[in-house]
């Protein structure tokens, strides 16, 4: 059944540690694209290595989908996630693979994680790109040059994959930024918080330091 929700829809708890170990093993078999601060490719890095120890700067994206009333669709990271498990994110976030554009990677994740297809939204646009580095407990870190993509949903139905998305809800985007005290129960992912702040404070720029499209 496809959903169009305004309140959180949480899955029942999974097996926790076992699922997390499975994800760690899966990450060890994958690569991410290592980049310079200006998002220039320097090579490939093992995904697990890029998120442990000192980390490796790599290419990533986060996507914010809105409805026609200005609400943003937030997704809760599943409890099997090793980093920022059960935290609330933008609509999707991930890493493109070698040879894949940010737009194509975003479309793929929207379809896989939420069952949202391209005919449901207008053109995806890269609205910002920034570098950040954050550690999470003793589990690892993110060190990313993160592109932000945005679009408006004309058909707000979706069908989340509980292995990836623990819950989903619509939130007034402006209210979330201006009144964070009302949303204290939502632990937000750092990359989403940065993207939202830059969006409202006028810092969003899809070209890092004005040097690259």
From Swiss-Prot:
UniProt record, GO biological process: dimethylallyl diphosphate biosynthetic process; isopentenyl diphosphate biosynthetic process
Domain Nudix hydrolase, first and last residues per copy: 56-193
Any one GO cellular component localisation term in the record: cytoplasm
Transmembrane intervals: none
Enzyme class: isomerase
Renumbered residue ranges of the record's region Disordered: 1-34
Residues annotated for Mg(2+) binding in this entry: 113
Cofactor stoichiometry and binding remark: Binds 1 Mg(2+) ion per subunit. The magnesium ion binds only when substrate is bound. Binds 1 Mn(2+) ion per subunit.
Active site as annotated: 144
Source organism, top-level taxon: Archaea
Reaction equations catalysed: isopentenyl diphosphate = dimethylallyl diphosphate
CDD domains: NUDIX_IPP_Isomerase
Record keywords: Cytoplasm, Isomerase, Isoprene biosynthesis, Magnesium, Manganese, Metal-binding
Compositionally biased residues, Basic and acidic residues: 1-10
Binding, Mn(2+): 51, 58, 95, 142, 144
Pathway noted in the entry: Isoprenoid biosynthesis; dimethylallyl diphosphate biosynthesis; dimethylallyl diphosphate from isopentenyl diphosphate: step 1/1
Cellular compartments annotated: Cytoplasm
Pfam families from the UniProt entry: NUDIX
Requisite cofactors: Mg(2+); Mn(2+)
Job description of the protein: Catalyzes the 1,3-allylic rearrangement of the homoallylic substrate isopentenyl (IPP) to its highly electrophilic allylic isomer, dimethylallyl diphosphate (DMAPP).
Family indicated by similarity: Belongs to the IPP isomerase type 1 family.
Protein name: Isopentenyl-diphosphate Delta-isomerase
Organism: Halobacterium salinarum (strain ATCC 700922 / JCM 11081 / NRC-1) (Halobacterium halobium)
């Amino acid at each position: 059944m496809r959903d169009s929700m305004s309140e959180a829809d949480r899955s029942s708890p999974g097996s926790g540690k076992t699922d997390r170990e499975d994800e760690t093993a899966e990450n060890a078999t994958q690569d991410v694209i290592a980049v310079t601060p200006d998002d220039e490719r320097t090579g490939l890095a093992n995904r697990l290595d890029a998120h442990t120890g000192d980390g490796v700067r790599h290419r990533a994206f986060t996507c914010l989908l809105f409805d026609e009333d200005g609400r943003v669709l937030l997704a809760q990271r599943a409890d099997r996630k090793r980093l920022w498990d059960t935290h609330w994110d933008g609509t999707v976030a991930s890493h493109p693979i070698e040879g894949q554009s940010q737009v194509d990677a975003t479309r793929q994740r929207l379809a896989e994680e939420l069952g949202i297809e391209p005919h449901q939204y207008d053109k995806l646009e890269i609205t910002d790109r920034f570098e950040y580095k954050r550690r999470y407990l003793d589990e690892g870190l993110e060190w990313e040059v993160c592109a932000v993509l945005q679009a408006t949903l004309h058909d707000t139905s979706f069908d989340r994959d509980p292995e990836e998305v623990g819950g989903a809800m619509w939130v007034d985007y402006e209210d979330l930024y201006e009144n964070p005290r009302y949303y204290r129960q939502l632990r937000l992912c750092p990359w989403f918080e940065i993207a939202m702040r830059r969006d409202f404070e006028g810092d969003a720029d899809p070209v890092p330091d004005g040097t690259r499209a």
